[in-house]
Curated annotation (Swiss-Prot):
GO terms for cellular component: nucleus. This is Transcription factor MYB27. Residues 6-58, 59-113 form the HTH myb-type domain. Its main location: nucleus.
Amino acid sequence: MDFKKEETLRRGPWLEEEDERLVKVISLLGERRWDSLAIVSGLKRSGKSCRLRWMNYLNPTLKRGPMSQEEERIIFQLHALWGNKWSKIARRLPGRTDNEIKNYWRTHYRKKQEAQNYGKLFEWRGNTGEELLHKYKETEITRTKTTSQEHGFVEVVSMESGKEANGGVGGRESFGVMKSPYENRISDWISEISTDQSEANLSEDHSSNSCSENNINIGTWWFQETRDFEEFSCSLWS
């Protein structure tokens, strides 16, 4: 019998006529015995449905509109103290229902907390990034020095010390020039080329001198032979 009665109860959205009838019954009998009120009102609704409809929508003492700053502060403090006990928190906020407070918390404060957590996370990442950048610069400086030492780079005196040593006139060493083994090999190679070229020039000069001497010797021999021939001819004619 009760099962059939429950099947005949109306469910779903409330109609305007149902709201008006429930308000009239509650104004006459008060907020009590919701199952009895549901039967007396003639509404095909359960007592729980009538109670929730009254408390969340039809009660004239309900506050409409957004939460005030004072209400936000109370919700924040009580939630930190009691957690998700929304009915207990609603008793401290007249005109606000537990369901309204719960929805407000989920849609506002949770987003605020997530935004704060994200802000802290980005701040932590930013600080870590600066620290990592600083460590990276230190590592690069150390690696550069190590590489210079491994390849035999020799650091010459700095510009300031070069100016002091040269009386304010800085040569090539005054500007901190670095010489590597590769540069030394290039210099040696250029020197070898210059030496070979000089030897080649000397060889050419020697060859030229030899040719000149040979030419002189040939000329002298030809002159002597011609002179002897002339003297011989004169002796024949005389």
